[in-house]
Curated annotation (Swiss-Prot):
Keywords: Activator, Nucleus, Repeat, Transcription, Transcription regulation. Component of the Mediator complex. Component of the Mediator complex, a coactivator involved in the regulated transcription of nearly all RNA polymerase II-dependent genes. Mediator functions as a bridge to convey information from gene-specific regulatory proteins to the basal RNA polymerase II transcription machinery. Mediator is recruited to promoters by direct interactions with regulatory proteins and serves as a scaffold for the assembly of a functional preinitiation complex with RNA polymerase II and the general transcription factors. GO terms for cellular component: core mediator complex; mediator complex. It is found in: Nucleus. Pfam families: Med14, Med14_C, RM2_Med14, RM3_Med14, RM5_Med14, RM6_Med14, RM8_Med14. Residues 1093-1102, 1153-1163 have a biased composition (Pro residues). A motif (LXXLL motif 2) lies at residues 468-472. Its main location: nucleus. This is Mediator of RNA polymerase II transcription subunit 14. The gene is MED14. InterPro entries: Med14_C (IPR056877), Med14_N (IPR055122), Med14_RM2 (IPR055113), Med14_RM6 (IPR055114), Med14_RM8 (IPR055107), Mediator_Med14 (IPR013947), RM3_Med14 (IPR056879), RM5_Med14 (IPR056878). Residues 1125-1149 have a biased composition (Polar residues). GO terms for molecular function: transcription coregulator activity.
Length: 1546
């Protein structure tokens, strides 16, 4: 607002007058804007500073009010300033007018003021104008001389003070006055009480302690000048109730001052008069203070029964009585009084009954004649002296019947301590004191405040003192009981005074009384220790202890009969638990200990007493000195009791164990004390042989136990190793000693048995540094907490069986290890052999380990495998199978060879991933990628995603046979849980090494029959496993064919041939004899050791002539029959497949047709021929014929691979297609993934009505067509690890022209399928998405192809794109949850297409891709309306970036002018070009997380290249507009009308 002009009267200048030169200046009362702003800022800052200083002193509400007022004022002020500044912008024109008006106003005011001033001068000033009369002489004097001497004298005297005396004169006067005072004191009469004085500064100060202080002086040096009283200070104080205030009022002091000053005039003994007056006043004041304190003490803290004021005469005496409860004739009282004989003496204290003069004077000095005047201190000190006197009399009475006892009387208040025992802690002594209020005796024992005897003793002290000796004896026994409890506090025992006897025992010791205690041993509930207590006759304060060991039993009532076995340490017959608890105790036997023997045995100190008059002998020189340092125990600790309890607790378990060993017929040497008395030991002389250790204690033969446990071996073998006599003798010679000791576990504080076996060396030398000596020890531990000693002995025998059984293996293995022909030292190394465990190291660097030990629970050997620093131990997968083989063969040599020969293939198999994956069969069901199932030590099954199964058999000569595990090895049908792997034979044939198949055959072996250790042996080791003959049989040799039962013949299918043998490899040359039907390809199974026909005496038909539908004999005839296959998926493209016809062999195999047979599909090509009729007559065919390798059953025939080939097959390696940038996978996983994807594609074609399956003449090729396109999916025949799509454009019908895709578009689809759909990880839902895209109209598919091209080649987008795009084939978890995660995310329905795009911000300025934000956008394209927009959920709040993308797509659809073309790709291009990233983008909701690209093959920079090449280069971005086939409006949006979409969401 504009400033308000002031009236003229308030303007500057005299009456508004302006000085000359300012008439033309600016108007009055104006100010510059800068100065105004400075003033406002200064005012605001000043108010803020004041506010900050004052606010902390105010309340919270006041602070809020002040802050609000300050904010309102400041806001109002700056609002006015803002309005003024805005107004000032347009004030230029007003300024000129203002200056003119200002000049005119100044001129006007100048005339008006001039007239007013002239009128005022003429009317007021000039009327009274006169010249004054000046004082000329005074002015001249002041101006000339600078002084004024004409002031009157009366004024000078009243105003100007007189001159003061000098300090020297003052000091001289005070010294003279001190001399006068000293002379007056010397010549006068001075009382003795006033001899303490000091003269200083002309005054003398007298001080009487605890009474007063007075200062005097004289006014002259004449003897007649009286003393002048200057100051009086009363020194009497009441520090307890006065609160530091003066006890005398100033008026009282003034009155005394005047009184004494009046008596000093003309008084010859003036100083004596001063003392008498003040002394009487101070003594009266002291008595008044003591009386007041007594009344207050009686009123506030004590009562009339404690202290009472009997008489009080002010200024004379005060009498107080105390201890009124005591029946004293005279009573106890004290009197504080002044001395009547001599008035100058201080207050005196008189005691009744009288105290000594020394004690009475001490009391007075402490309480009255001190600075602290206190009646309480007077009474307390009096009571203390009285207490010491009474306690001294009591001490004399105690000394009469307690001899040689040290009594102690000390402390404040006084305490008399009486020792009860010797030695005795001070806390265990009787503390006797006197109650200060009542004067009664009080006694207690500080350590035992709950002692019931102290009350009786206190009554005896205050009454009949003849009972004190008996009460002291009772207290002595009671404290001894507590000492016993304290001693046993940290021992496994509990002390009690009584036991719950149903009938009182007859022994005199156990009768009622307090002179014994019962000690219950925690670890031995049936044993008690009775401790008898006695006082020594020579020294009553010392105790004697006698120990008795009692055996007790528990009963519930009198009718409960106790067996005599309770008298023994270990009950022979275990008593069953009773429903009724047994509370009562019955003593069975009582044994008295010799206390001296029990406390002076091994483990105790040596008592050496040497007579002082006896000379030391020569033998005593080596003995320890007589004054050896004794162990100092606390007084409450009873070493004899602790030693006996510890001895019982330690020896009773040994006695129980020894009795149990005797019951098990195990000889021992009894309990002994080791050398140097270190511990107790129980020596076992011998242990029985494990197979003969069954006793009458309830043990069963271990063979039966093995059968009961379900681990009984097959017939023909023994469950336990046979212990040869020479092996047992050798072990017995090596056992040096077996010792049993008892120790305490440091961690759990539980007592355990430690059994020490000492052996002499071992038959098997190890490389462990601690196992190089000839003395070997084995320590076994057992718990003692269960009190079951039979169980402990059984556990000892079980551990002994572990040693013996492992020794039987090691004894034979040591001999074979020393045999250099077996070369076992090159296979493994013995890391450790501790008689309980055998640790073998094997592998290339001998870093993986196998631990072998005997398990009592499973009644057999167990194996545990541990990996090394740089390798894992893959044998853990077949741990149970190896253990079963060892328990059947009992040969460590075979185990060593198996471990050595199977290490490499098992390590290769262990490299396969076993992680669970989601989204394989169903999105929420996890499935293992690979699962290893060991069948036997040399037979392993691998399952892939619970669909496919591979059977691996480890052979000799570093060979492995692999076959399809879906084909049964016992029957001719297919296992229901698995699916045959199509193309497995052809894939494995690429890794076959032909030279390795012949390495196992030496030239001289042609004339000799095969050994059971051939390539077809089950284990490829020195021997085969008994009872696993089924592993060597073939599913294609008839239902009656079973392997031999002999453990050495499981690998031989036929008797020894008379023809030269050949390799069992199916790729070796066939024998000259032809197969039945002329179509055999000489395919032999893994269990055929030779290729010649079997002997004619075989109990079953020949596989060459009596198996018309066997997979080993493929028939070229179109009418051949075959057993039903595992799945019809692989046979639908073969018109002459044997699975499409009825099998005539059902009468031979009634259970074989386990799956339905599909009917022949129509439209099969008549040119389709069978490929199984070729006959191999030449040399070895590496892969067999093409038709044979591609047959569905070809994988059931084993294929031999080397260990190196298996390592290549299982080791992760880069993808063959360099354009697919994924994690390294093994070739086997890629092959199985492609086969699985091809199988899922075949099933998808059958389930989708929009896809039409076509017949293919090539095996393993999926051929189908969609609208206008024919698609062919096949494996890459070079490596069979990738799937490829080949699309062919079908010619359009002549009557209906359709939109045609260019060859470049088809190439993009093929490249996208190869790098994004059929790439790892292999997910079938990606196939669903691509199939639904192929089923779209050609115009829409063209735009999707453009998006695929932009994803494959981001550089074709040019520099204008700010985002990269990837099309999602599966639903990512970070997208809006429209479709379940993992499902196919391309959904068709109601002429609309829902798909998901992931866009990623292109980094600029050198940023990394990982820092770029990414979005997953759900896009909906409406085919009918030609509209592209985002799919949104109403119940969810979208993120700002999703909202921005939706706005861009909506704006593009509104302003899109090209209605004759598909809007999908242009809308996506516009979105990638114009979508801006908000700098402060908030966090997205949980279901729309911003992160890196999801899925496989959708990452930025992943798969930039393409598969193959096109003759024409891809079109640039300017040419990516789709070409619309028909011109003109055919349907809405320029598209032909389409029917209902058959490919809706599944």
């Amino acid at each position: 607002m504009a400033p308000t002009p002031l009236p003229l009267e308030q303007m500057s200048g005299v009456g508004g007058y302006l000085p000359a030169g300012q008439e033309g200046g600016p108007r009055i009362n104006t100010m510059s804007m800068s100065m105004l702003i400075d003033f406002i800022i200064q005012r605001t800052y000043h108010e803020l500073t004041v506010l900050a200083e004052l606010l902390p002193r105010k309340t919270d509400m006041e602070r809020k009010i002040e802050i609000y007022n300050y904010a309102a004022r400041t806001r109002h002020l700056f609002t006015r300033l803002n309005a003024l500044v805005k107004w000032g912008n347009s004030v230029s024109k007003v300024d000129k007018s203002s200056q003119i008006m200002s000049f005119l106003d100044k001129q006007n005011m100048l005339f008006v003021e001039t007239a007013d001033m002239l009128a005022r001068m003429s009317r007021e000033t000039l009327v009274r104008a006169r010249l004054p009369n000046f004082h000329i002489p005074a002015a001249v004097e002041v101006l000339t001389t600078g002084t004024y001497n004409r002031l009157p004298t009366c004024i000078r005297e009243r105003i100007v003070p007189a001159d003061a005396i000098t300090p020297a004169e003052k000091k001289q006067t005070l010294l003279r006055l001190n001399q006068v005072i000293q002379h007056r004191l010397v010549t006068g009469k001075l009382l003795p009480q006033m001899r303490e004085f000091r003269i200083k500064n002309g005054r003398v100060t007298f001080e009487v302690k605890h009474e007063f202080s007075v200062a005097l002086t004289v006014m002259g040096d004449s003897q007649n000048v009286p003393w002048r009283l200057l100051d009086i200070d009363v020194l009497v104080e009441d520090k307890e109730t006065g609160d530091g205030k003066s006890l005398v009022h100033p008026l009282q002091v003034n009155y005394i001052h005047q009184l004494i000053q009046a008596r000093l005039v003309e008084n010859p003994n003036a100083l004596s008069e001063v003392y008498n007056c003040l002394h009487y006043f101070c003594q009266s004041l002291q008595l008044e203070v003591l009386y007041t304190q007594t009344l207050r003490l009686n009123y506030e803290r004590l009562d009339d029964n404690n202290i009472t004021v009997e008489e009080y005469v002010p200024g004379v005496k005060l009498t107080v009585s105390y201890w009124r409860d005591l029946k004293s004739e005279l009573g106890y009282r004290l009197t504080v009084q002044s001395d009547p004989s001599e008035i100058g003496r201080p207050l005196a204290v008189v005691h009744v009954p009288s105290l000594g003069a020394k004690e009475s004077a001490e009391v007075a000095d402490r309480a009255v004649r001190s600075e602290h005047l206190s009646m309480e201190r007077l009474i307390v000190h009096t009571v203390y002296i009285r207490s010491v006197s009474r306690l001294s009399d009591l001490k004399l009475e105690f000394q009469a019947f307690l001899k040689d006892v040290d009594f102690n009387l000390q402390g404040t208040p006084a305490i008399l301590t009486v020792p009860v025992l010797s030695p005795c802690l001070r806390a265990e002594q009787i503390h006797i004191t006197i109650d200060t209020h009542t004067g009664m005796f009080r006694c207690h024992v500080p350590k035992h405040l709950d002692c019931p005897i102290t009350d009786e003793m206190q009554e005896a002290l205050n009454g009949d003192r003849s009972k004190l000796p008996s009460l002291l004896s009772e207290l002595r026994y009671w404290i001894t009981h507590r000492r016993c409890e304290k001693t046993l506090q940290h021992l496994p025992a509990t002390a009690t005074d009584t036991l719950t006897f149903l009938t009182q025992p007859e022994q005199e010791l156990l009768q009622q009384g307090r002179h014994k205690i019962y000690v219950k041993l925690h670890r031995h509930p049936n044993i008690i220790l009775v401790v008898q207590l006695k006082e020594k006759s020579t020294m009553a304060n010392e105790m004697e202890y006698t120990f008795h060991l009692g055996f007790v039993a528990f009963q519930k009532d009198e009718a409960d009969v106790i067996d005599d076995s309770a008298k023994q340490l270990v009950s022979v017959v275990a008593q069953p638990p009773s429903d009724i608890p047994k509370f009562f105790t019955k003593l069975m036997r009582l044994i008295e200990f010799d206390t001296f023997v029990a406390t002076h045995g091994p483990g105790t100190e040596v008592d050496a007493e040497v007579s002082p008059h006896k000379r030391k002998s020569t033998g005593d020189i080596l003995a320890p000195p007589a004054k050896q340092q004794k162990t100092i125990f606390p007084a409450y600790f009873i070493p004899e009791l602790a030693h006996v309890v510890a001895m019982c607790d330690e020896k009773i378990p040994f006695m129980n164990l020894a009795q149990t060993l005797s019951k098990h017929n195990i000889p021992h040497s009894g309990l002994q004390v080791e050398a140097n008395a270190t511990s107790l030991v129980l020596k076992i002389l011998a242990l029985p042989q494990p197979g003969k250790s069954a006793t009458a204690a309830g043990q069963q033969p271990q063979q039966g136990a093995a059968s009961a446990a379900g681990t009984a071996p097959p017939s023909g073998s023994s469950a336990f190793p046979r212990i040869e006599p020479h092996v047992w003798d050798d072990l017995m010679r090596r056992v040096l000693s077996i010792s049993v000791r008892s120790q305490t576990n440091k961690n759990s504080q539980v007592r355990i048995w430690v059994v020490e076996f000492v052996f002499y060396s071992t038959p098997l030398q190890s490389c462990h540094p601690k196992e190089q000596g000839s003395r070997r020890t084995v320590y076994l531990t057992y718990e003692q907490a269960n009190h079951d000693f039979s169980k402990t002995v059984e556990e000892l025998l079980n551990d002994w069986s572990k040693i013996v059984y492992l020794y039987t293996l090691v004894y034979d293995f040591a001999e074979q290890l020393r045999n250099k022909r077996l070369a076992l030292c090159d296979m493994l190394v013995v890391k450790s052999y501790s008689y309980m465990n055998l640790l073998l190291g094997y592998g290339p660097k001998k870093e993986v380990s196998c631990n072998i030990y005997w398990s009592v629970q499973s009644h057999g050997f167990r194996l545990t495998f541990v990996g090394g620093m740089s390798a894992v131990n893959a044998h853990s997968m077949m741990r149970d199978q190896l253990a079963q083989h060892l328990n059947q063969q009992h040969s460590l040599t075979q185990i060593a060879q198996i471990l050595h020969e199977t290490y490499n293939p098992m390590s290769s198999i262990a490299k396969l991933p076993v992680l669970p994956f989601l989204g394989i069969p169903r999105p929420q069901v996890p499935v293992l990628s690979f699962c290893m199932l060991a069948q036997s030590p040399c037979l392993m099954r691998l399952t892939y995603q619970a669909v496919y199964c591979l059977e691996l058999r480890f052979r000799a000569n570093r060979l492995v046979s692999i076959r399809d595990g879906a084909s049964s090895r016992f029957e001719r049908n297919v296992i229901e849980e698995f699916t045959p792997i199509q193309g497995l034979k052809a894939f494995l044939s690429k890794y076959v090494d032909e030279s390795a198949a012949y390495r196992g055959r030496a030239p001289h072996e042609d004339d000799n029959p095969l050994s059971p250790i051939g390539m077809e042996d089950n284990y490829g080791g020195p021997s085969s496993v008994t009872g696993v003959s089924a592993g060597g049989s073939s599913p294609f040799l008839g239902a009656g064919m079973r392997g031999p039962q002999s453990p050495r013949d499981s690998g031989l299918r036929f008797p020894a041939p008379h023809t030269p043998p050949s390799s069992s490899n199916p790729h070796t040359p066939a024998s000259p004899h032809p197969s039945a039907g002329g179509g055999g390809a000489a395919q032999s199974h893994g269990n055929f050791n030779l290729t010649s026909p079997p002997a004619p005496h075989m109990p079953h038909p020949s596989p060459g002539g009596l198996m018309p539908s066997s997979p080993l004999n493929p028939q070229p005839s179109p009418h051949m029959v075959h057993s039903p296959g595992p799945n019809t998926l692989y046979m639908q493209s073969h018109q002459d497949s044997p699975f499409t016809a009825m099998s005539p062999a059902n009468n031979q195999w009634p259970g074989s047709p386990s799956m339905p047979r599909p009917s022949p599909r129509p439209g099969q090509s008549p040119e389709h021929k069978s490929t199984g009729g070729s006959v191999v007559t030449g040399g070895p065919d590496r892969g067999g014929s093409r038709g044979t390798l591609n047959r569905p059953w070809a994988g059931a025939v084993p294929t031999l691979l080397t260990h190196e080939a298996l390592e290549t097959l299982c080791r992760p390696s880069p993808h063959p297609n360099k354009d697919i940038n994924v994690t390294d996978m093994s070739p086997l996983e890629r092959f199985l993934g492609c086969v699985y994807m091809r199988r899922q594609l075949h099933r998808n074609i059958q389930n989708e009505e929009s896809l039409t399956a076509l017949n293919s003449t090539e095996p393993g090729v999926v051929l189908f067509k969609v609208d206008g396109l024919q698609c062919q999916v096949m494996l890459n025949q070079m490596h069979m690890q990738t799937l490829h799509l080949k699309i062919t454009q079908l010619p359009p019908p002549p009557d209906k022209p359709t939109f045609q895709l260019s060859p470049d578009d088809l190439l993009v689809i093929e490249q996208y399928f190869d790098t994004r759909v059929a790439a790892p990880p292999y997910r079938p839902n990606s196939l669903h998405s691509i199939c639904r895209l192929l089923n779209l109209p050609a115009q829409v598919l063209k735009d999707f192809v453009q998006i695929m091209r932009l994803e494959l080649k981001p550089e074709f987008g040019g520099d204008q794109l700010k985002w990269t795009v990837q099309m999602c084939m599966r639903m990512p978890p970070s997208a809006v949850p429209i479709v379940p995660s993992g499902n196919a995310c391309v959904v068709l329905g109601r002429m609309k297409i829902l798909f998901f795009l992931q866009i990623t911000k292109i980094p600029f300025n050198g940023k990394d891709w990982k820092d770029s934000p990414s979005l997953v956008l759900p896009i909906v394209y409406d085919i009918t309306m030609n509209l592209t927009q985002m799919a949104e959920r109403r119940e969810q709040v979208p993120s700002p970036m999703m909202t921005a993308a939706s706005t861009l797509l909506r704006r593009f659809s509104e302003f899109n002018s090209q209605q004759n073309q598909c809007s999908l790709f242009p809308a996506i291009t516009d979105l990638l070009t114009n979508l801006q990233l908000a700098t402060d983008m908030p966090q997205p909701p949980p279901n729309q997380a911003i992160g890196p690209p999801v899925g496989v093959g959708v990452g930025v920079g992943v798969g930039i290249g393409v598969v193959g090449s096109s003759p024409n280069p891809m079109m640039p971005m300017q040419q990516l507009q789709p070409q619309v086939g028909p011109q003109g409006q055919v349907g809405p949006g320029g598209y032909p009308q389409l029917g209902p979409n058959p490919g809706g969401p599944q």
